[in-house]
A protein has these predicted regions:
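Aromatic-lined, polymer-binding surfaces characteristic
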Residues: 93
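Histidine-centered, transition-metal-coordinating active-site segments
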Residues: 1-86, 96-415
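Alpha-helical scaffold segments that flank or form the walls of functional sites
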Residues: 89-90
């Protein structure tokens, strides 16, 4: 295979990149992932959480390579030489289509040309303007690229090939859970990666299954995922600053359309270009967003500068109501809260912030994790059954000056 490159990784140690993979990694399309943070605004709560989609993608490639090699040894003939090469590359490229700030900006509120990151990834792989497309064609040929996309999408291939990189027990989740836990310093849960990798088998119908003797390893993995959502991904500062960023960009678009705010070319591409090409999309990173938002802190518009000032200097952060609310309860108290906030001299629209939280728990049956005997793992684990319910609640933020009055009002409605 020629020369190899060794990369030292904080989570996995030495990662080995074969020569063909190195050529993919060295493209501009892939190097862009160095400038997209894995956890968006989590660094406001966890200062060390500035790791990127680049390091995560290399880690997923590493785990996919390990798992494929192990499965080939234990299940001879199940994975062809071509697929053994393509599955790790598919894992490497699984996040190639992420927008700036990852999932946070993956919304039509921000992008005038909206598509999910999986769709943008496919467009980048196929667009002749993108250097990654030409490198893949050179290395894999057109049929190889078609097979690569089929594996990434799970179309026309053995299910387990896709499940290695996208399922409820995939190498993507293995890497980001352990990496995010390590780098945020969140000492909770944890799972035995080595045991989990060894527990994965291939069923007769071509699905990934786990040994009944490894249920405890899967339990630890799923419980860790549950804790990470509670403590990190749904942290109140992460949720609040995410809203600040999205609202700042929405306001910037409004001001631009009214002629009162010039936008940089890349910001126009994101907010106003309804015919955004994959090549132009693949030039968007966190860096230009941060630079523009910091400039807006001095703008004359109080709404735009208010959001930008909070993000750039942490001045005047809104405070969370110390009451557990569901979405329906928030809607019931919204108008009274807006009236109270307005009477206190604040903006009832921009100073009442609702951050809904919703995350599906473990999904059983067709999408679930199956044992070798065909049962869903939930049937053999009361613990997994207990975390299969959907998590849904709301965070409400208001100015500090009126938080206590708002809490009194909400409590009066909930009686």
């Amino acid at each position: 295979m020629g020369d190899k490159r060794y990369i030292r990784d904080a989570l996995h140690g030495d990662l080995i990149l074969p020569d063909d993979v190195r050529k993919i990694v060295d493209t501009r399309s892939f190097q862009r992932l160095r400038y997209i943070q894995q956890l968006a605004t989590c660094h406001y709560a966890f200062p060390s959480a500035t790791h990127t989609r680049f390091s995560h993608s290399l880690g997923v490639f590493h785990l996919a390579t390990r798992l494929v090699e192990d499965l080939r040894e234990r299940f001879p003939g199940k994975i062809s030489d071509e697929d053994a090469r393509l599955v790790p590359i598919a894992a490497l490229l699984h996040d190639i289509g992420h927008p700036p700030f990852s999932h946070m900006f993956e919304t039509p509120e921000v992008f005038a040309t909206f598509a999910g990151h999986e769709e943008w990834g496919k467009r980048i792989l196929l667009d002749e303007e993108c250097d990654l497309s030409s490198v893949l064609k050179e290395l894999l040929g057109e049929s190889g690229v078609e097979r690569l996309i089929a594996i990434m999408e799970g179309n026309g291939v053995a299910p387990f090939l896709h499940e290695i990189i996208s399922s409820q027990l995939d190498v993507d989740r293995f890497d980001y859970l352990l990496r995010d836990q390590l780098i945020t310093g969140t000492d909770v849960g944890g799972f035995d990666l080595e045991r989990l990798l060894r527990a994965i088998n291939i069923s007769e119908d071509g699905r990934l299954v786990v040994s009944i003797y490894s249920i405890s390893a899967v339990e630890a993995y799923l419980v860790t995922r549950w804790h990470m959502y509670q403590l990190v991904y749904f942290h109140k500062l992460n949720m609040l600053t995410s809203v600040y960023y999205v609202r700042a960009l929405v306001r910037a678009r409004e001001l631009h359309e009214s002629g009162s705010l010039p936008l940089s070319l890349k910001m126009r591409d994101m907010l106003s270009n309804r015919d955004l090409t994959p090549y132009r999309y693949s030039q968007l990173t966190d860096s230009f967003v941060i630079a523009d938002v910091f400039q807006w802190a001095d703008h004359d518009d109080p709404v735009l500068s208010g959001y930008a000032r909070r993000l750039s200097s942490r001045d005047g952060f809104h405070k969370r109501l110390r009451i557990e609310l569901n979405h329906q309860q928030v809607e019931e108290v919204r108008e009274p809260l807006m009236e109270l906030i307005e009477q206190a001299g604040f903006d009832p629209v921009h100073d009442l912030i609702h951050a809904p939280l919703r995350k599906e728990g473990y999904l059983p049956y067709q999408e679930g994790i199956h044992l070798e005997d065909g049962r869903d793992i939930m049937e053999a684990s009361p613990l997994i059954e207990s975390i299969s319910v959907e998590f849904s609640r709301s965070m409400v933020f208001v100015p500090l000056e009126v938080r206590e009055q708002c809490e009194e009002l909400v409590n009066s409605f909930l009686k």
